[in-house]
A protein has these predicted regions:
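Helix-coil-helix junctions within alpha-helical repeat/solenoid scaffolds
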Residues: 219-222, 233-297, 305-315, 320-321
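Tandem amphipathic alpha-helical repeat scaffolds
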Residues: 1-5, 34-44, 67-82, 108-121, ...
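Amphipathic alpha-helical segments of tetratricopeptide repeats
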Residues: 14-21, 52-59, 91-102, 131-142, ...
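Flexible inter-repeat linkers and adjacent short helices
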Residues: 1-76, 96, 250, 290-294, ...
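Loop-centered beta-sheet repeat module
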Residues: 127-197
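Alpha-solenoid helical repeat architecture
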Residues: 25-30, 61-70, 101-108, 141-149, ...
């Protein structure tokens, strides 16, 4: 599973499941199996169930089971957008990393931490961790798919930094790797990210073309990390004045997204329906309360800047100044959080 070969993991799981009756005879082995089963479900795109019923592991002495418990809970919380919980389990897994001797597992830890920081719009920290991961995967045979995953993450971190030439280089390299390894789903993920890459450059039509293709091929239900793609599809259609299409993707998005993106979709829907500025302000302030709780300072920066511009256009310089300052504060907090430790 660490090498991210989904089909190979599926075959291996079938072999292990055939001996499940024996596994259940020993509590520690069954606990280990259950943790890996949870990890497999996430690898397969199933995030419906959290790791419940295994809280007792937290009270045990330090062990690899305790590490896996916190590490897998960290992955789950990151993917479903519960960043406060993710931070809690990340810190505890990091404390236990010292007892993990397998360098592949340490590399996997840094890869997952890189994704976490990417989701929090902290690209410098993301790049720092993904390079630690890539150092191992590049030097060892059998991790080609993982190398592709790391390059995909590097590409998206570069998008966040506005380094689009370098971002394209990483994303295309990742796509080539996945295609050579016949990994269709990861390759589709890169195509989806290419849509985000074009959207960040205000190339709406190109973004829509890539994202629409990925949206159709991914099918239902949508995985948590695809929430942004659906949102960006709606947003780019809105920017082009395609309100019917924008509404369609808003409705699709709210069916299977995290709480974080419920706020994004709700605000976008208000803009599509041309709600009053007062109503839009109310929705943004509700969202900001949530974003502050989870330290999503980039979102706070963007929305308060938009509110500032709208209030300035409406002739209310007092409110415009208030929101410009909030945007400035969020930008500084984001910069502070993103510094290398």
């Amino acid at each position: 599973m660490f090498s991210q070969h989904i089909e190979k993991a599926r075959i291996l799981k079938k072999e292990v499941d055939s001996n499940l009756h024996r596994i259940k005879e020993t509590k520690e082995i069954f606990t280990y199996y259950s943790l890996l089963e949870f990890r497999y479900q996430m690898l397969s795109g199933n995030f419906e169930n959290d790791l419940e019923g295994f809280e007792f592991i937290q009270d045990q002495s330090d062990s690899f089971l305790k590490y896996y418990y916190h590490f897998f809970k960290f992955i789950y919380a990151t993917e479903v957008g519960n960043y406060s919980s993710a931070e809690y389990h990340y810190e505890r897994a990091e404390q236990l990393l010292i007892i993990i001797l397998d360098e592949a597992e340490k590399a996997e830890f840094h890869y997952r931490v890189a994704l976490y920081y990417y989701y929090l719009s902290q690209p410098t920290l993301a790049i720092n961790h993904v390079n630690k991961s890539l150092d191992f995967f590049n030097e060892n045979v059998g991790y080609e798919t993982k190398v592709g995953a790391c390059k995909n993450t590097l590409g998206m971190a570069c998008v966040t930094l506005g380094q689009f030439d370098l971002a394209e280089e990483y994303l295309v390299s990742a796509l080539n790797t996945f295609q050579q390894e016949n990994e269709e789903r990861p390759a589709l993920t890169v195509r989806y990210n290419l849509g985000l890459f074009y959207a960040d450059q205000d190339l709406s039509e190109l973004a829509i073309r890539h994202l629409t293709s990925a949206f159709k091929q991914f099918g239902h239900p949508k995985e948590p990390y695809q929430k942004r793609g659906t949102y960006v599809l709606a947003r780019e259609h809105f920017k082009l004045g395609n309100f019917k299409e924008a509404n369609f993707y808003v409705e699709e998005g709210v069916q299977s997204c995290t709480k974080e993106y419920i706020y994004h979709f709700t605000i976008l829907k208000a803009m599509i329906e041309n709600e009053s500025l007062e109503k839009l302000e109310e929705l943004v302030l509700e969202a900001i309360s949530y974003f502050k709780e989870h330290e999503l300072f980039k979102d706070i920066q963007v929305y308060t800047e938009e509110l500032a511009a709208k209030w300035y256009g409406a002739g209310d310089e007092c409110k415009a100044g208030k929101y410009f300052y909030m945007s400035y504060e969020a930008k500084n907090l984001l910069k502070e959080k993103g510094r290398l430790k």
